Protein backbone atom coordinates (compact mmCIF):
# COMPACT_ATOMS: atom_id res chain seq x y z
CA UNK A 1 0.00 0.00 0.00
CA UNK A 2 2.79 2.42 0.90
CA UNK A 3 4.39 1.85 -2.50
CA UNK A 4 1.27 3.18 -4.19
CA UNK A 5 0.30 5.75 -1.52
CA UNK A 6 3.52 6.74 0.30
CA UNK A 7 1.85 9.08 2.82
CA UNK A 8 -0.89 6.67 3.79
CA UNK A 9 -1.59 6.10 7.48
CA UNK A 10 -2.06 2.45 8.41
CA UNK A 11 -3.13 0.78 11.62
CA UNK A 12 -3.68 -2.96 11.83
CA UNK A 13 -5.31 -4.80 14.70
CA UNK A 14 -6.72 -8.17 15.61
CA UNK A 15 -8.43 -9.67 18.64
CA UNK A 16 -7.34 -7.09 21.22
CA UNK A 17 -7.69 -3.92 19.11
CA UNK A 18 -9.99 -1.02 19.93
CA UNK A 19 -12.50 -2.13 17.30
CA UNK A 20 -14.81 -5.12 17.34
CA UNK A 21 -13.48 -7.52 14.71
CA UNK A 22 -16.95 -8.95 14.22
CA UNK A 23 -18.59 -5.56 13.70
CA UNK A 24 -15.88 -4.53 11.22
CA UNK A 25 -16.33 -7.76 9.25
CA UNK A 26 -20.09 -7.22 9.09
CA UNK A 27 -19.75 -3.62 7.90
CA UNK A 28 -17.22 -4.74 5.29
CA UNK A 29 -19.83 -7.08 3.86
CA UNK A 30 -17.84 -10.21 4.68
CA UNK A 31 -20.66 -11.95 6.50
CA UNK A 32 -23.33 -11.74 9.17
CA UNK A 33 -23.35 -12.70 12.82
CA UNK A 34 -25.03 -16.03 13.38
CA UNK A 35 -26.77 -17.35 16.46
CA UNK A 36 -23.51 -19.00 17.47
CA UNK A 37 -21.85 -15.58 17.65
CA UNK A 38 -19.54 -16.21 14.69
CA UNK A 39 -19.35 -14.16 11.53
CA UNK A 40 -20.71 -16.43 8.81
CA UNK A 41 -19.50 -15.80 5.27
CA UNK A 42 -20.77 -17.46 2.08
CA UNK A 43 -17.25 -18.62 1.21
CA UNK A 44 -15.81 -19.69 4.58
CA UNK A 45 -18.82 -20.25 6.79
CA UNK A 46 -17.62 -19.65 10.35
CA UNK A 47 -14.12 -21.00 9.71
CA UNK A 48 -12.15 -17.76 9.52
CA UNK A 49 -9.82 -15.59 11.56
CA UNK A 50 -10.77 -11.92 11.76
CA UNK A 51 -8.48 -8.91 11.65
CA UNK A 52 -8.58 -5.48 10.11
CA UNK A 53 -6.35 -2.80 8.64
CA UNK A 54 -7.36 0.85 8.84
CA UNK A 55 -6.03 3.10 6.10
CA UNK A 56 -6.38 6.81 5.40
CA UNK A 57 -7.61 6.15 1.87
CA UNK A 58 -11.22 6.86 0.90
CA UNK A 59 -13.09 3.82 -0.41
CA UNK A 60 -16.63 3.23 -1.48
CA UNK A 61 -18.30 1.45 1.43
CA UNK A 62 -19.29 -2.17 0.97
CA UNK A 63 -22.88 -3.25 1.34
CA UNK A 64 -23.65 -5.41 4.38
CA UNK A 65 -24.44 -9.02 3.57
CA UNK A 66 -28.18 -9.56 3.80
CA UNK A 67 -28.45 -13.04 5.21
CA UNK A 68 -29.42 -14.67 8.48
CA UNK A 69 -29.84 -17.96 10.29
CA UNK A 70 -33.58 -17.85 9.68
CA UNK A 71 -35.40 -20.16 12.07
CA UNK A 72 -32.37 -22.43 12.59
CA UNK A 73 -31.41 -22.97 16.24
CA UNK A 74 -29.22 -26.07 15.86
CA UNK A 75 -26.17 -24.46 17.49
CA UNK A 76 -28.22 -23.23 20.44
CA UNK A 77 -29.84 -26.63 20.88
CA UNK A 78 -26.57 -28.57 20.61
CA UNK A 79 -24.33 -26.39 22.81
CA UNK A 80 -23.12 -28.83 25.50
CA UNK A 81 -23.51 -26.36 28.37
CA UNK A 82 -26.31 -24.12 27.11
CA UNK A 83 -23.87 -21.22 26.77
CA UNK A 84 -25.56 -19.83 23.65
CA UNK A 85 -28.48 -17.67 24.72
CA UNK A 86 -29.68 -16.74 21.22
CA UNK A 87 -29.24 -13.92 18.71
CA UNK A 88 -25.48 -14.28 18.70
CA UNK A 89 -25.12 -13.77 22.44
CA UNK A 90 -22.94 -15.99 24.61
CA UNK A 91 -22.66 -16.67 28.33
CA UNK A 92 -18.88 -16.98 28.33
CA UNK A 93 -18.78 -18.36 31.87
CA UNK A 94 -20.53 -21.50 30.61
CA UNK A 95 -18.73 -21.79 27.25
CA UNK A 96 -16.47 -24.85 27.06
CA UNK A 97 -13.94 -22.92 24.99
CA UNK A 98 -13.61 -20.50 27.92
CA UNK A 99 -13.71 -23.20 30.58
CA UNK A 100 -10.87 -25.20 29.02
CA UNK A 101 -8.66 -22.11 29.26
CA UNK A 102 -9.32 -21.30 32.92
CA UNK A 103 -6.71 -22.28 35.47
CA UNK A 104 -8.84 -23.11 38.49
CA UNK A 105 -11.08 -25.93 39.66
CA UNK A 106 -14.01 -26.83 37.43
CA UNK A 107 -17.40 -27.77 38.80
CA UNK A 108 -18.35 -31.42 38.32
CA UNK A 109 -21.09 -30.37 35.91
CA UNK A 110 -18.53 -28.86 33.54
CA UNK A 111 -16.00 -31.66 33.97
CA UNK A 112 -18.57 -34.07 32.56
CA UNK A 113 -19.49 -31.68 29.73
CA UNK A 114 -15.87 -31.06 28.69
CA UNK A 115 -15.34 -34.76 28.09
CA UNK A 116 -12.15 -35.36 26.13
CA UNK A 117 -11.56 -31.78 24.99
CA UNK A 118 -8.10 -30.47 25.80
CA UNK A 119 -8.60 -26.95 24.49
CA UNK A 120 -11.59 -25.16 23.07
CA UNK A 121 -14.87 -26.41 21.62
CA UNK A 122 -16.17 -26.25 18.05
CA UNK A 123 -19.58 -27.88 18.52
CA UNK A 124 -21.52 -24.78 17.50
CA UNK A 125 -19.45 -24.58 14.30
CA UNK A 126 -19.50 -28.29 13.54
CA UNK A 127 -23.31 -28.45 13.60
CA UNK A 128 -23.90 -25.21 11.67
CA UNK A 129 -25.63 -25.86 8.31
CA UNK A 130 -23.81 -22.85 6.85
CA UNK A 131 -20.56 -24.83 7.18
CA UNK A 132 -21.68 -27.74 5.06
CA UNK A 133 -19.32 -28.25 2.15
CA UNK A 134 -16.78 -25.75 3.52
CA UNK A 135 -13.16 -26.90 3.32
CA UNK A 136 -11.69 -26.30 6.77
CA UNK A 137 -8.17 -27.39 5.81
CA UNK A 138 -5.43 -24.89 5.02
CA UNK A 139 -1.99 -25.75 3.72
CA UNK A 140 -0.34 -23.33 6.16
CA UNK A 141 -2.17 -24.80 9.17
CA UNK A 142 -1.41 -28.52 9.08
CA UNK A 143 -0.56 -30.04 12.45
CA UNK A 144 1.25 -33.30 13.04
CA UNK A 145 -1.00 -36.03 14.48
CA UNK A 146 0.88 -36.12 17.79
CA UNK A 147 0.30 -32.37 18.15
CA UNK A 148 -3.32 -32.45 17.03
CA UNK A 149 -4.24 -35.41 19.24
CA UNK A 150 -1.50 -35.80 21.85
CA UNK A 151 -1.20 -38.78 24.17
CA UNK A 152 -2.76 -37.83 27.47
CA UNK A 153 -0.57 -39.52 30.08
CA UNK A 154 2.72 -37.86 28.97
CA UNK A 155 1.03 -34.48 29.44
CA UNK A 156 0.48 -35.03 33.15
CA UNK A 157 4.06 -34.43 34.28
CA UNK A 158 5.41 -32.56 31.28
CA UNK A 159 7.94 -29.89 32.22
CA UNK A 160 7.52 -26.25 31.28
CA UNK A 161 10.51 -26.54 28.94
CA UNK A 162 9.06 -29.57 27.16
CA UNK A 163 5.64 -27.95 26.93
CA UNK A 164 7.04 -24.79 25.37
CA UNK A 165 9.24 -26.66 22.89
CA UNK A 166 6.36 -28.91 21.82
CA UNK A 167 3.35 -26.61 21.91
CA UNK A 168 4.77 -23.10 22.27
CA UNK A 169 4.10 -22.27 18.61
CA UNK A 170 0.36 -22.92 19.00
CA UNK A 171 -2.23 -20.33 19.99
CA UNK A 172 -3.48 -22.70 22.67
CA UNK A 173 -0.17 -22.51 24.54
CA UNK A 174 -0.65 -18.93 25.69
CA UNK A 175 -2.34 -20.04 28.93
CA UNK A 176 0.51 -22.36 29.84
CA UNK A 177 0.46 -26.05 30.64
CA UNK A 178 -1.74 -26.01 33.75
CA UNK A 179 -5.16 -25.88 32.01
CA UNK A 180 -4.03 -28.46 29.45
CA UNK A 181 -2.85 -30.83 32.17
CA UNK A 182 -6.09 -30.44 34.11
CA UNK A 183 -8.09 -31.09 30.95
CA UNK A 184 -5.95 -34.15 30.17
CA UNK A 185 -6.82 -35.56 33.59
CA UNK A 186 -10.51 -34.94 32.93
CA UNK A 187 -10.19 -36.62 29.53
CA UNK A 188 -8.61 -39.71 31.12
CA UNK A 189 -11.60 -39.89 33.46
CA UNK A 190 -13.91 -39.51 30.47
CA UNK A 191 -12.23 -42.45 28.73
CA UNK A 192 -12.20 -44.52 31.97
CA UNK A 193 -8.50 -45.11 31.28
CA UNK A 194 -7.55 -47.64 33.96
CA UNK A 195 -3.99 -47.93 32.64
CA UNK A 196 -3.45 -44.30 33.68
CA UNK A 197 -4.22 -44.96 37.37
CA UNK A 198 -0.52 -45.22 38.45
CA UNK A 199 0.32 -41.88 36.81
CA UNK A 200 -2.82 -40.26 38.22
CA UNK A 201 -1.93 -41.49 41.71
CA UNK A 202 1.55 -40.04 41.33
CA UNK A 203 0.05 -36.69 40.36
CA UNK A 204 -2.55 -36.83 43.14
CA UNK A 205 0.11 -37.48 45.78
CA UNK A 206 3.04 -35.38 44.62
CA UNK A 207 2.02 -32.57 42.26
CA UNK A 208 2.65 -29.24 44.04
CA UNK A 209 -0.51 -27.63 42.61
CA UNK A 210 -3.67 -28.22 44.68
CA UNK A 211 -6.01 -27.91 41.70
CA UNK A 212 -4.13 -30.55 39.72
CA UNK A 213 -3.97 -32.88 42.73
CA UNK A 214 -7.67 -32.47 43.41
CA UNK A 215 -8.64 -33.10 39.81
CA UNK A 216 -6.46 -36.22 39.74
CA UNK A 217 -8.17 -37.59 42.87
CA UNK A 218 -11.55 -36.92 41.23
CA UNK A 219 -10.45 -38.68 38.02
CA UNK A 220 -9.30 -41.76 39.92
CA UNK A 221 -12.72 -41.97 41.55
CA UNK A 222 -14.41 -41.69 38.17
CA UNK A 223 -12.30 -44.45 36.63
CA UNK A 224 -12.55 -46.88 39.53
Walk through the language-model features, giving the residues of each.
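Catalytic cores of enzyme domains
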Residues: 1-146
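Hydrophobic alpha-helix feature that most strongly marks membrane-spanning transmembrane helices
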Residues: 118, 129, 133, 189-193, ...
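A detector for short metal-coordination/catalytic motifs
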Residues: 130, 134-153, 179, 189-190, ...
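Alpha-helical adaptor scaffolds
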Residues: 145-178, 185
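Alpha-helix N-cap/helix-start positions at coil->helix boundaries
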Residues: 174, 178-179, 194, 208-211
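Structural detector for internal amphipathic alpha-helices that build alpha-solenoid repeat scaffolds
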Residues: 181-193, 213-223
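C-terminal/domain-terminus segments
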Residues: 202-209, 214
